[in-house]
């Protein structure tokens, strides 16, 4: 879902040097995540995508050290589980019509009728961090 990497990280899929083919989903996913030029450089020219290149196109969330990565993971883990599940379902959908799939719509409805949404409103009113339970 999210990629966190330090400044020395790099990414490479050496299919051309190994002589095998990639499925269409993987090729198009690389294009969507990296952009056409970087995906071509990585797949066709067998080039590494550096952390700075990956960060520039939003492929990674750059961090300076493991502690910063852990802090980021901790902050994400504190977010509302139902909202996260609905967002991930909608973001991963293959439908380009901008309509929510039936699964994403059901999760949307569950999120808005959950106790988590009530807790978020209450916590905001009380100026405190919400405590989510995924219900």
Regions found by a protein language model. Name each.
Residues 1-42, 57, 68, 72:
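CoA-thioester-processing core
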Residues 4-9, 55-103, 115, 132-135:
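C-terminal long alpha-helix characteristic of the crotonase
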Residues 42-43, 90-94, 107-112:
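Helix-loop "lid/cap" segments that line or gate small-molecule binding pockets
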Residues 46-53:
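Acidic, divalent-metal-coordinating active-site segment for phosphoryl/phosphodiester hydrolysis
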């Amino acid at each position: 879902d999210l990629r966190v990497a330090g400044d020395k990280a790099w990414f490479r899929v050496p299919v051309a040097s190994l002589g095998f083919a990639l499925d269409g989903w993987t090729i198009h996913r690389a294009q969507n995540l990296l952009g056409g030029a970087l995906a071509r450089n990585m797949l066709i020219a067998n080039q590494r995508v550096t952390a700075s290149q990956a960060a520039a196109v939003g492929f990674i969330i750059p961090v300076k050290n493991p502690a910063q990565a852990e802090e980021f993971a901790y902050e994400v883990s504190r977010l509302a589980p139902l909202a996260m599940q609905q967002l991930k379902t909608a973001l991963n959908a293959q439908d380009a019509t901008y309509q929510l799939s039936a699964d994403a719509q059901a999760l949307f409805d569950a999120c808005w009728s959950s106790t988590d949404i009530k807790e978020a409103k209450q916590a905001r009113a009380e100026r405190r961090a919400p405590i989510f339970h995924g219900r």
